Design a protein with these regions (language model features):
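Catalytic histidine-centered segment of alpha/beta-hydrolase-like enzymes
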Residues: 250-263
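Conserved alpha/beta-hydrolase "nucleophile elbow" surrounding the catalytic nucleophile
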Residues: 30-32, 96, 100-102, 220
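Flexible "cap/lid" loop of the alpha/beta hydrolase fold
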Residues: 109-114, 118-155
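Conserved alpha/beta-hydrolase catalytic His-Asp/Glu region
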Residues: 133-141, 151-209
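Active-site loop/oxyanion-hole signature of alpha/beta-hydrolase fold enzymes
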Residues: 7-14, 53-99, 103, 264
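Conserved HGGG/HGGXW glycine-rich cap/lid loop of the alpha/beta-hydrolase fold
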Residues: 12-69, 87
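Catalytic histidine neighborhood in serine/cysteine hydrolases
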Residues: 228-252
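Short beta-strand/loop motif that positions the catalytic acidic residue
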Residues: 211, 217-219, 223
Length: 274
């Protein structure tokens, strides 16, 4: 099994693309079940103001599956963090604005702990340090639900995709549901299961106090994957400055279902004039 960072050009392996020519660099990292096309509605807007870097996470169906090592990526997010740091180094990027969606939000946090100079600002979109309830912490899922998810992915992957996509994206947005269902369904089932285990078993609550890079936490008003309370948990536990912005929309993918609303919030967050 090859390692992404030892493959030669990690930028090529992860299908990196750069848009715009702004003076500041904005890195967009997609979440589970997506690929870089998740940003297609926001890209034309953001590229007017920034040099925007997009890429595919290693679990994406667009990446050579030989690069996905379950032993490396299933146990924790270290493999993903290694990849992100290597990717930014390869492109000679530092002092970037990083927008990570869902699990990629925590990957950005972990990378910022290791190499804080790579980032000036972390934008955590629909991110969570832990998805499973734990005592007084409400993550949104009970362990039994997560175990059932693993079982469904393993036994009837496409059936699970068709059931999970509308729940995650929000029943009322057919375009967002269709987009997510398409990319999720293109994943190889064994990779989808392995990556799901990495996400749902993750617990980075103890890492949050080490995150010193300023954070903006953006969360949909209603999200069945990440409860609104998690956004405030992150704000109250990171080590650096943080603010929460709640979007008046539904679903785990506001970049698909409410991109104009999200862009307005990003303009405000990043102090874009015009």
């Amino acid at each position: 099994m090859e390692m992404v960072c030892e493959k030669g050009s990690i930028a090529t392996a992860l299908n990196a693309k750069i848009y715009g020519n702004g003076s500041e660099t904005l890195v967009l990292a997609h979440g589970y079940g997506e690929d870089q096309s998740a940003w297609q509605l926001l890209l034309p807007l953001l590229a007017c103001y920034f040099k925007v870097v997009v890429f595919d996470m290693v679990f994406s169906p667009n990446v050579n599956p030989k690069l996905y090592d379950p032993e490396r990526y299933q146990t924790d997010f270290k493999g993903y963090t290694d990849d992100l740091v290597c990717f930014l180094d390869h492109l000679h990027l530092h002092n970037t604005i990083y927008l990570g969606h869902s699990m990629a939000a925590m990957v950005g946090c972990l990378a910022s702990i290791r190499r804080p100079h790579l980032f000036t600002h972390l934008i955590l979109l629909s991110g969570s340090p832990r998805y499973i309830d734990d005592g007084r912490y409400y993550g949104g899922f009970e362990r039994s639900e997560v175990n059932e998810t693993y079982k469904n992915i393993e036994q009837n992957f496409m059936g699970w995709v068709q059931d999970f996509a509308p729940k995650a994206a929000g029943q009322n947005n057919t375009a967002a549901v269709a987009k997510f269902e398409k990319t999720l369904g293109r994943m190889k089932p064994y990779i989808a299961l392995s990556a799901a285990k990495a996400v749902f078993s993750s617990d980075f609550r103890h890492k949050l106090p080490q995150v010193m890079v300023p954070c903006t936490i953006i969360q949909s008003k209603k999200d069945v994957i990440v409860p609104q309370s998690v956004a405030f948990y992150i704000k109250n536990n990171v080590g650096g400055n943080a603010i929460v912005k709640i979007l008046n929309t539904e679903g785990h993918f506001p970049h698909l279902s409410a991109h104009n609303l999200l862009f307005r919030v990003l303009k405000e967050t990043l102090q874009i004039k015009n």
